[in-house]
Amino acid sequence: MKENFWSELPRPFFILAPMEDVTDIVFRHVVSEAARPDVFFTEFTNTESFCHPEGIHSVRGRLTFSEDEQPMVAHIWGDKPEQFRETSIQLAKMGFKGIDLNMGCPVANVAKKGKGSGLILRPDVAAEIIQATKAGGLPVSVKTRLGYYEIDEWKDWLKHVFEQDIANLSIHLRTRKEMSKVDAHWELIEAIKNLRDEIAPNTLLTINGDIPDRKTGLELAEKYGIDGVMIGRGIFHNPFAFEKEPREHTCKELLDLLRLHLSLFNKYEKDEIRQFKSLRRFFKIYVRGIRGASELRHQLMNTQSIAEARALLDEFEAQMDEDVKLEL
């Protein structure tokens, strides 16, 4: 194996969860500006497309990163071990520091085809994929869930994953069936850690699910002795979630992050071709907590260009109180 960056991380370390159509190079840089995590994962990259001579063009943008984001981990999915093998070799050449395998995506058209969380029901294939991915020489990690249908599946499934000698396991503390409709099962963290200690003490354990910020993550790490904390949806409510010394933030700071997002979208649009409308999902992150925010969001949703969005921000900020504090 090439250098294992996982062993050099602080304890506990913090990761921005991979999220489809969210954690691209643009949003990762915005989060980094607000408060940087220790590790970044890419969006989801399909191994079948990556290995196809034509499909590669449709996914390459998902793998765009800059050196200031290191250590960068490529998050990939599929169900053909040979495609994971080839993908891993190419990802190593591209400069990634690690590869993370998606065995937790609950979306129906993924899971029901035996991919993502569907691999929980195909443990032999999951093991083959893990071993095949090691061909690239990068540390291999897995992101998965407690089970597919029932919570009680966790012990057999995670025991099987731990036996594969992986660098890190990120466990979303819900089943595929639960999606994100119930509270994460924090009550299982201790038992999962005990299983890890018994089966694979050298595999790092990262928890994910309902963790809103670094403060909460530190409390869980101290209580249970886990190695890492992954924050996903919490970043939508608080882009400063990874802040080491939390402080009050102003509405203007959020709008400044939106301006940065717009600028970076322009900067990287040649590397990662996306339509302007893909930005709309982000507006609610930055525009809130101030009088007129709802109307501004509505207006931004109807814009068709970066220039239009900037003009609206200029007009809005000319009339706002820059010192209004946020309640995150």
Swiss-Prot record:
Keywords: Flavoprotein, FMN, NADP, Oxidoreductase, RNA-binding, tRNA processing, tRNA-binding
Covalent S-S links between cysteines: none
Class of the enzyme per the UniProt entry, highest EC level: oxidoreductase
SUPFAM superfamilies: FMN-linked oxidoreductases (SSF51395)
EC number in record: 1.3.1.-
Pfam family, one: Dus
PROSITE patterns noted in UniProt: UPF0034 (PS01136)
CDD domains: DUS_like_FMN (cd02801)
Membrane keyword on record: no
Signal sequence, start to end: none
Superkingdom, natural source: Bacteria
Active site residues of this protein: 105
Catalysed reactions listed for this entry: a 5,6-dihydrouridine in tRNA + NAD(+) = a uridine in tRNA + NADH + H(+); a 5,6-dihydrouridine in tRNA + NADP(+) = a uridine in tRNA + NADPH + H(+)
Binding residue positions for FMN: 18-20, 143, 208-210, 232-233
Names of required cofactors: FMN
GO MF assignments: flavin adenine dinucleotide binding; tRNA binding; tRNA dihydrouridine synthase activity
Gene3D superfamilies in the record: Aldolase class I, Putative flavin oxidoreducatase, domain 2
Function, in words: Catalyzes the synthesis of 5,6-dihydrouridine (D), a modified base found in the D-loop of most tRNAs, via the reduction of the C5-C6 double bond in target uridines.
Family affiliation: Belongs to the Dus family.
Name under which the protein is recorded: Probable tRNA-dihydrouridine synthase
Organism: Staphylococcus aureus (strain MRSA252)
